[in-house]
Design a protein with these regions (language model features):
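Conserved phosphate-binding and hydrolysis motifs of nucleotide-dependent enzymes
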Residues: 11-16, 104, 142-144
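FAD-binding core/adjacent interface of flavoenzyme oxidoreductases
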Residues: 1-4, 64-141
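Beta1-alpha1 glycine-rich phosphate/pyrophosphate-binding loop at the start
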Residues: 2-72
Length: 144
């Protein structure tokens, strides 16, 4: 797929980031738009549960030069729907010739009472870190 055209990538996590870099590395010359719901640039998620929870100075951002890649990066826009030709977000509509869905998953809340927190994104990690204190008791569900 080296010809022109418009590719829209919904999801600016590692999979979306890798999709746009791979397209360019394989010679795709068309328009690429990368859309992410988070306001941050793409970042690596594994450090969220390791370094970000314990260290203020960690930046898990992927080194992305969207200008050099000629990628239109739209942050803070959540995909809300699509049809065969257009991806809709909470801000705009993006026509495409090819669509890559790389939105990932959402956490599932467990039934029952109790305070549940999720570790899905950078802001979740910061919120959890703020709750940590000596003697805190917690249960961790999931090993993703």
């Amino acid at each position: 797929m080296t010809d022109g055209g418009r590719v829209v990538v919904a999801g600016a996590g590692l999979a979306g980031f890798r999709a746009v870099t791979e397209l360019r590395e394989r010679g795709f010359t068309g328009q690429i738009t990368l859309i992410g719901a988070e306001t941050r640039p793409p970042y690596d998620r594994p450090p969220l549960s390791k370094k970000v929870l314990t260290d203020d100075g960690v930046d898990p951002s992927l080194q992305a030069d969207f200008g050099a890649l000629d990628v239109d990066f739209r942050s803070g826009e959540a995909a809300t729907g699509m049809d065969a030709q257009t991806l809709a977000t909470d801000r705009d509509k993006y026509p495409y010739d090819r669509l890559i869905l790389a939105t990932g998953a959402v956490p599932v809340a467990l039934p029952g009472p109790g305070r549940q927190r999720f570790l899905r994104n950078y802001d979740d990690a910061l919120a959890l870190r703020a709750l940590f204190r000596p003697g805190l008791r917690l249960a961790i569900v999931g090993a993703g």
